[in-house]
Amino acid sequence: SEWLDRGTTLTPELAWSDAFRMELDRLDELPNKAGGRASKEFPNKEDADFWNAKAPQWLADYVNWRNEMFDAGWSWLQVRGEDAIEVPVTATLFDVEVKGFIDRIMVSPDGEVHVVDIKTGSREPASLQLNVYQHLLEVVHDVHASHGAYYMARKGTTTEPKPLSISMETIARYFASAKKGIESEIYLPNVGMLCGTCGVRQPCSVFSE
């Protein structure tokens, strides 16, 4: 959807965005089955046929949502003279280098800054990622975001915006703990629904035995 926000007109020929191409390429690279649930329409779950069928509609829904937001008085934040779309942020938080890309940063009609992350999954993630983006945005660009939300592509809208209230110290401890585990070569499996499409399933101790 990035090229949509930078002024390219949506056409059937352009309905394949780079993001969905990456999803399809990733499916081919995975050593295991596609994720999601099997259905009458898509018996092979979320395989290439699923993404080919769903991506154009999701993109059209996104354009409608974005235009409705603009009509309601929302706007893109300006970062270094450009619309805040796919904003790269890299900073060191308590000796841990953290890199990311903030999908969208918007300004509400009353002037509050909101970070928005685009998700193609069906479940709303926890808010930790949005809080990390808040602190990275403040450190790198000296901009304070008060709220965050996820744009859920399957629903064509965002989750309810939430105040970003997790402290930098809490986030720093999270990354410091992860760094310590990596340096000690301690990798604890986090078994769950995402295991079916995990890119490191084969070497994982849960599935390799």
Name what the model sees in each region.
Residues 1, 104, 133, 148, ...:
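A residue-level signal for conserved active-site and pocket-lining positions in enzyme catalytic cores
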Residues 38-39, 111-115, 175-182:
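Short amphipathic alpha-helical segments and their helix-coil junctions
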Residues 94, 122-125, 137-209:
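Metal-dependent nuclease catalytic regions and adjoining charged, substrate-binding loops involved
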Residues 58, 129-133, 174-177:
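Alpha-helical scaffold elements adjacent to nucleotide-binding pockets in ATP/GTP-utilizing enzyme cores
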Residues 79, 84-135:
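Non-catalytic protein-protein interaction segments used by genome-maintenance enzymes to assemble
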Residues 1-85:
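A non-catalytic, helix-rich entry segment at domain boundaries
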Residues 46, 102, 196:
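Residue-level detector of short, conserved catalytic/binding motifs and their immediate flanks
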Residues 2-6, 135-140:
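Active-site catalytic microenvironments for nucleophilic, acid-base chemistry
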